[in-house]
Amino acid sequence: MSAPSALVKQPPIQSTAGACPSRNEKGRAVYGEGEGETVCVGKAAADYVPMESSEEEDEEFQFIKKAKEQEVEPEEQEEEVANDPRLRRLLQNRITEDVEERLARHRKIVEPEVVSGESDSEVEGEAWRVEREDTSEEEEEEIDDEEIERWRGMMRQRAQERKTEELEVMELEDEGRSGEESELESEYEEYTDSEDEMEPRLKPVFIRKKDRITVQEREAEALKQKELEQEAKRLAEERRKYTLKIVEEEAKKELEENKRSLAALDALDTDDENDEEEYEAWKVRELKRIKRDREEREAMEKEKAEIERMRNLTEEERRAELRANGKVVTNKAVKGKYKFLQKYYHRGAFFMDEDEEVYKRDFSAPTLEDHFNKTILPKVMQVKNFGRSGRTKYTHLVDQDTTSFDSAWGQESAQNTKFFKQKAAGVRDVFERPSAKKRKTT
């Protein structure tokens, strides 16, 4: 049931006017015949206490006080209600609750009950309370009329506001779509925020000062990174330009080289050459080349055959062959005599296959400081490179014993004795000259 219908169409109040109330054992007022004494309206109860009141009377008093407070400043209250939608909603709910409570109270049917006899004071108190209820009902009816008028004014104002809102909605129809999108975004943000709030919180971790990154440091780092990127772009552009320049220079060089080659070919004059003479000269050079290759090949084959023949000879035949046909030594030099502590120079082994006078010189002749007689020097100075970092320790090893008796080779043991007798060279009693081929032992 709506609030207007509840206020206008009130049900008839069922009452027992003119009946004599009486109290039962529970202290309630009942109407009708009973065993107890009856009390007529207008008689005061002897046990009435003016300062006492029931819960229902307290509620009525609070409601009347609230209504009077509302009547004090109706204009200000109506202005606040019109401006604030929350107050309007609160007032409407309050009016609805009051109407429902009043209807429930008026619909209460009081049935007659059989009560026991009570004292005259109780009957008089009940009569006074009934009279108080009648007067409060009249005041409530007056307050209800005022509330209805106030409620109708509020409804008219609300209808006017609804019309204004409908006009604004029609004017802002296009903007509503964007508003819905923003609202969806805000709802999504609220949803994400709520999700973030539901996430587990992490334990705070201490970060050292040198490892912290503040906003200024982050901005400085971003600026530095941007400068580095710009510098890298600049260097890449310079490299590209330098590469293009090098390619252009190389292309120019190749073009100039081709031009020079063509110019040299054009400048070559071959009109005066005789092709027959050139061909005859080439034939002579080719024949000499062929002859030289054949002679080298024959000499190599002859040398291999001689080596094979010498290998097949016995020891006596080989000695006789060497005595009869001595070995021919090319560029044989005269063997000279070296002086005391004279430096030795080797003439080398290359290019000795053909006789040359320069290779036949005496290379044992003294040079530079070797002309001096070093035998007259003191014993301590008779060493090579005396006074230098490369000086030798001994003059020569003829008079020096360099045997190391502490080494493993100098120890007398069964293993060393067996090695010296069977494998060591120069320590056995019998000496056999090794041959070119290994002899087969049967």
Curated annotation (Swiss-Prot):
<dbReference type="GO" id="GO:0005634">
    <property type="term" value="C:nucleus"/>
</dbReference>
<protein>
    <recommendedName>
        <fullName>Microfibrillar-associated protein 1</fullName>
    </recommendedName>
</protein>
<keyword id="KW-0747">Spliceosome</keyword>
<keyword id="KW-0539">Nucleus</keyword>
<feature type="region of interest" description="Disordered">
    <location>
        <begin position="1"/>
        <end position="34"/>
    </location>
</feature>
<dbReference type="Pfam" id="PF06991">
    <property type="entry name" value="MFAP1"/>
</dbReference>
<dbReference type="GO" id="GO:0071005">
    <property type="term" value="C:U2-type precatalytic spliceosome"/>
</dbReference>
<keyword id="KW-0507">mRNA processing</keyword>
<comment type="similarity">
    <text>Belongs to the MFAP1 family.</text>
</comment>
<dbReference type="GO" id="GO:0005684">
    <property type="term" value="C:U2-type spliceosomal complex"/>
</dbReference>
<comment type="subunit">
    <text>Component of the spliceosome B complex. Interacts with PRPF38A (via N-terminal interaction domain).</text>
</comment>
<comment type="function">
    <text>Involved in pre-mRNA splicing as a component of the spliceosome.</text>
</comment>
<dbReference type="InterPro" id="IPR033194">
    <property type="entry name" value="MFAP1"/>
</dbReference>
<dbReference type="InterPro" id="IPR009730">
    <property type="entry name" value="MFAP1_C"/>
</dbReference>
<feature type="region of interest" description="Disordered">
    <location>
        <begin position="113"/>
        <end position="203"/>
    </location>
</feature>
<feature type="compositionally biased region" description="Acidic residues">
    <location>
        <begin position="181"/>
        <end position="198"/>
    </location>
</feature>
<feature type="compositionally biased region" description="Acidic residues">
    <location>
        <begin position="134"/>
        <end position="148"/>
    </location>
</feature>
<keyword id="KW-0508">mRNA splicing</keyword>
<dbReference type="GO" id="GO:0000398">
    <property type="term" value="P:mRNA splicing, via spliceosome"/>
</dbReference>
